[in-house]
Amino acid sequence: MTNKIITYILKPLGFLAILTFVLIQLNRVLSFKYDDGICQMEQFYKQEENSIDVLVLGSSHAFVNINPQILYEQGGIQAYNLCASMQPTWHTYYYLKEALEYQHPKLIVMDVFRLVENADYSKETALIKSTYGMKLSSNKWESIRAGLSRERQSEAYIYLFEFPAYHGRYEDLTREDFVFDKEKMENYKGFYPVSKVAPMKRPELENITECTPISQKTWDYFQQILELAKTEEIPVLLVNVPYIQSEADKKIFNTLEEHLQNYDASYQITYIDFNQKYDELGIDFDTDYADYDHLNESGVDKLNYYLAEFIKEHYDFGS
């Protein structure tokens, strides 16, 4: 009788264990494996608590162009790129909120390129890349909701639990879905190297002085980032890394420079527009770009040698 009871209990438990294992493996295979957003956040959680000196925020302009390895080699700076492709400022804000649950960096470096965003809601790919790596939390929930229009708020749960959004990927599976190595992002500290070379024409924008307004929602969340950093007493180094800047973008960043004058010293904000420092960096437009938006390894080296020296000179991380 006792054996029958044990068998009666163990059979369903065994079935549940097998089912759980199968679902976990299925989830692993079907899940999105973007290494330009999701992996950066997933590997961030594996960093030792309070081990990050410099938290890098932004879009691909940040995670392709800022190399934590060079910052460490040149200045002993422990940096991590917590970024995602095409990331609007509302998702960046919630990335920062989430990061502060686990780390208290001594400096935030934020690339400002996405201030050119004029849409009020996230594109599907940007929403996924900016939220799917996050643990289940209020920050993830609010980030998803911020990225959806009022008419789509009822869909937020799909992105919160993730699986419903990618359960139909069976026909799209490739070999990479079974062997994808997410751990490399932990080793690269969120950096995404690009090695190709694409000759570019140097932008000539020195005479562009007009200003174009920054989208209200984009600016509101950017301000929240600065306010949160101030509350946490973390200085902010805003950067505009080298890319082939358009006249329209230049007018947006002229507006940014005007707005930043309204922030007093208590915010500890510094802004460097590297698009005005091509010669100082030694940028070669024939050899240092991968495409219109990103430097290649040669250009990245030049940018990060400068950045490491600047951080060492202007910020004291102590011990």
Name every feature range the model reports, one short phrase each.
Residues 29-50:
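Alpha-helical transmembrane signal-anchor/signal-peptide segments
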Residues 288-319:
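Histidine-centered active-site loop/cap adjacent to the catalytic His
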